[in-house]
């Protein structure tokens, strides 16, 4: 028994005629007849009764057909799945991201990326250190984090962005085109907790103004929410700030403080067209939305 014989049997059962089955398989009618005879010999079953120009499936043929049809449905499913994977329409994608991205930017992008219904995606919002661990352990295919760009065992792409100053709507500083370290005066500064690379960069660049009355928070979104409620001002990463751009004022800072992020993959990870496409499209989406919002040029 071979697959071609099974295909011939299926074609005859589907069409009910040898001639139509031959057309379906793009072979001659004698070739179909020969394949059916060989299949009957291999199975030791009489599958069809010949009545003139007509063939009638036997009960044995009907019983066998149920299994053959199930098998071909399974093969078709495998074929369709392989085609979907080739078109990057199916597969799995596990993303780990720091909260500044996981709480706003990535959901925006995923809403349009997930138009492929067979793509299984998980998004984990984690501190940057845990993002790196998730990628290293294989729990995430790609990660977005803050941290040093030189790390062994990772493939890292850096995305540099200038920090901005977030102030309440109608605040005196909102009227400025650019804010210098001296201009906050006695304003309450909302700063991110010590320990993150971004917080360290801010401390190094403008440590003197951080000695003024301040609030300390762990998340960019918390700082931005406090700014919106006029509890103070904050030096913030624009990726998080975009979610608040209609409820606060964002102004460039005169000193460049890198508020970018890293795209991280494992150096030992298997290549994936789905991950490659996600990374490329997210990068384009991020840059386009930031430029459209006027937060970067």
From Swiss-Prot:
Signal peptide: none annotated. It comes from the Bacteria. GO terms for molecular function: DNA-binding transcription factor activity; sequence-specific DNA binding. The keyword Kinase does not apply. One of its GO terms (biological process) is positive regulation of gene expression. Pfam families: HTH_1, LysR_substrate. This is Octopine catabolism/uptake operon regulatory protein OccR. It comes from Rhizobium meliloti (Ensifer meliloti). The gene is occR.
């Amino acid at each position: 028994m071979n697959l071609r014989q099974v295909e011939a049997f299926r074609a005859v059962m589907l069409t009910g005629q040898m001639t139509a089955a031959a057309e379906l398989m793009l072979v001659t009618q004698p070739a179909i007849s020969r394949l059916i005879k060989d299949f009957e010999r291999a199975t030791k079953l009489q599958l069809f009764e010949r009545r003139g120009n007509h063939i009638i499936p036997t009960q044995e043929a009907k019983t066998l057909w149920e299994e053959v049809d199930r098998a071909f449905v399974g093969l078709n499913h495998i074929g369709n799945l392989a085609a979907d994977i080739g078109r990057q329409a199916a597969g799995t994608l596990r993303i780990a991201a720091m909260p500044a991205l996981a709480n706003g930017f990535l959901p925006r992008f995923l809403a349009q990326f997930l138009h492929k219904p067979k793509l299984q995606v998980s998004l984990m919002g984690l501190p940057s250190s845990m993002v790196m661990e998730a990628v290293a352990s294989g729990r995430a295919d790609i990660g977005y984090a803050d941290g040093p760009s030189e790390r062994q065992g990772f493939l890292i792409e850096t995305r540099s962005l200038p920090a901005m100053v977030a102030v309440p709507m109608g605040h005196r500083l909102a009227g400025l085109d650019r804010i210098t370290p001296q201009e906050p005066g006695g304003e309450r500064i909302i700063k991110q907790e010590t320990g993150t690379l971004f917080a360290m960069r801010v401390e190094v660049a403008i440590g003197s103004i951080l000695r003024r009355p301040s609030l300390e928070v762990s998340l960019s979104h918390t700082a931005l929410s406090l700014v919106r409620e006029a509890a103070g001002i904050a030096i913030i990463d624009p990726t998080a700030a975009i979610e608040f751009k209609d409820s606060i004022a964002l102004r460039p800072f005169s000193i460049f403080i890198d508020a970018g992020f890293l795209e991280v993959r494992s150096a030992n990870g298997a290549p994936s067209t789905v991950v490659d496409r996600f990374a490329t499209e997210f990068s384009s989406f991020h840059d386009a939305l930031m430029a459209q919002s006027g937060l970067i040029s």
